[in-house]
Amino acid sequence: MSETSPAPEPAIRFACLLSDRAALAVSGPEAAHFLNNLLTAEIEGLAVGAGVPAALLTPQGKVIADMLVFNASDDEPLYLIDVAAGLAEDLARRLMLYRLRSAVTIDRLGPEVGIAVIAGHPAPEGEAHYRFDDPRDAAMGARLIGPRAELAALIPADQATDEAAYHAARISRGLPECGKDFLAQSAFPHEVNLDQLGGVAFRKGCYIGQEVVSRMEHRGTARTRTMIVEMLNGFNVMGGAECRAGDRVLGIGGECAGARGLVPMRIDRLAEALAAGEAIALGGVPVRVIRPDYARFPVDMG
């Protein structure tokens, strides 16, 4: 069973600190140029106060780490990177390796620096933290980066939610994150919809893995795309479960929240299964497959 977009959703509301995210700071006169030469997104043209999804790739074009990059420049260039906490150390190490003689400073900000997310409520103002709109989806509200203790105090008790509310909203909007919905170095940017979310610049110069990604784009060879799946019986499934149609494996699911999950799946096999009227299941649980609202890639949903 499938449909091209989710049924109408209640308004997205969450307000919490994210324990599974960390921040890096890249500063210095050549910070924008340095990041632009490494990451998939256009960084040099990023306006102050704006953000963009991006990824660092292997030379073979696989995602090492996805991230949100924010231009926090004031008098001096400063870019803040919002990344999965489990990937932060490795990302910082890799950026340091590429720094060479570039006039940049790379800091892995410590646990005293937190990232909070707020949607459905006005984001609190303050001088000790940075506030950015989520560049992937306006419905996902704002992200605040600053002292963890201050951010915790800024969230009113009557608005506070747990992190599960954020992840349920993220999944319902079709926004995959490395480490939760796919493993590092397992997927190309197209396979996790980074190109659909504005995280791949196809008109800029070279970056690591650019040749593979560009070839996939211009030849239209991306057969795997990340889709939303909704458990029809309301149950959740553990991450890593196979999504199957009969004896065909469509993909491997990530973590589930709110009876939904994300699956990078073979859309050619999905189309064949739907055309044949085959039931689709994730970890043995029947699911409905939903194409994200933002998706522009072709897929025959039957």
PLM regions with names:
Residues 1-65, 73-74:
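Acidic, proline/glycine-enriched N-terminal capping motif
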Residues 14-25, 68-176:
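Acidic, low-complexity central loop/insert segments
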Residues 30-35, 88-92, 123-126, 148-155, ...:
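Short, conserved charged micro-motifs
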Residues 42-43, 96-104, 155-165, 245-250, ...:
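A common structural junction motif
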Residues 55-60, 118-128, 233-246:
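Short amphipathic alpha-helix segments
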Residues 163, 169-195, 232:
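Short, conserved active-site entrance elements at the starts or edges of catalytic domains
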Residues 192-200, 214-302:
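Glycine-rich, small/acidic residue-mixed loop/short-helix segments
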